[in-house]
Amino acid sequence: MWHAENCDLCGDCLVRCQYVDYDRVKAVQQIKQLMAGKPAEILELCITCVACNEYCPTAANPFDLINRLQEVHKSLPIPEKSRKFMDAGGTMPSALIKGDDSKPALSMCVMEPFISNDAVGGRMFEDMTVVKGGEYFCYLGYVHIGMDSPLIENARGFIDKLAGIEAKEIVFFHPDCYAMISKMPDYGIEVPFKAIHIIEYMRNYLKAHSDEVVPLNRKIAYQRPCASRYSGEIETILDEMFDLIGVERVARKYDRESAQCCGSLFSRIYPDRIKPMMEANVEDASKAGAEAMVFLCPLCMGALARPAGEKGMKPVLLSQLARMALGELPFPA
């Protein structure tokens, strides 16, 4: 939620934006226009990476204002195909597969069609109750097509459906779902279960079963997804997980707070702007000495797997990497 009372017009959010070249005067001018509800230039140039929320030193959440006004002013030239893709999320076939009630449940959102069969399995996910499909769709992806209202309209149904599992704890495989949960206080909705980020769940499992872990001794580049901007506290947990499995997260330009969006959607909308940045992101990972490019979001992997492979880096989902450390999967040759 946008907190106008927190904004001191410092301009940091847009000065640090990697997708525009604003000095502080221009940045402040843009924020003032946004605060007045005007169709500021940034509404069209923003690629919805959410980074400005993380950059803001006063927790004003400028992206939330930008995103709301993108919808009001219809600022983004979203292809009809992309809108239909998003709308299809809520209509996908759903399933609830009962498991051991003493374990947390696992929500897959609508990600199952976008991952390989070995991404979820083995001892770490054994006997968990699993829910998946449109009935458990989180709707957060709509922010990437410049829309905020679908989140608000579907928030209650999202929580109610998950509550119907009657699980005390739910692990969210898709980072967007965990991000959506973080928005519930803004919507005045109580969450009647403990939400667990997939990274926290895997870290906890690996820590509890450290005697089963075989250090991988690999260097990887991590592609931080846009949804992680809503849950910055997970970064230290991820670093701990990498330490547990003997993986070095290479230091590079486009990581952590300076991570770039994968470009999956906006490379189609603004190819001249975004494709060179995607190439720079992958090149950055390669030059840092990464043997693999590791993804949390399956859609990020879909966008960057091929260019990463062309640079000699194996594309790997984070859950696959954890299973490799448990000896359940081989590190790709």
Regions found by a protein language model. Give the residues of each.
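Iron-sulfur (Fe-S) cluster-binding segments and ferredoxin-like electron-carrier domains
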Residues: V15-K32, Y55-V72, S267-A285, A303-M313
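Cofactor-cradling patches in redox/metallo enzymes
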Residues: A119-G121, M128-F193, R229-Y230, T236, ...
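A broadly conserved sequence feature marking short terminus-proximal activation segments
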Residues: M1-A27, Y254
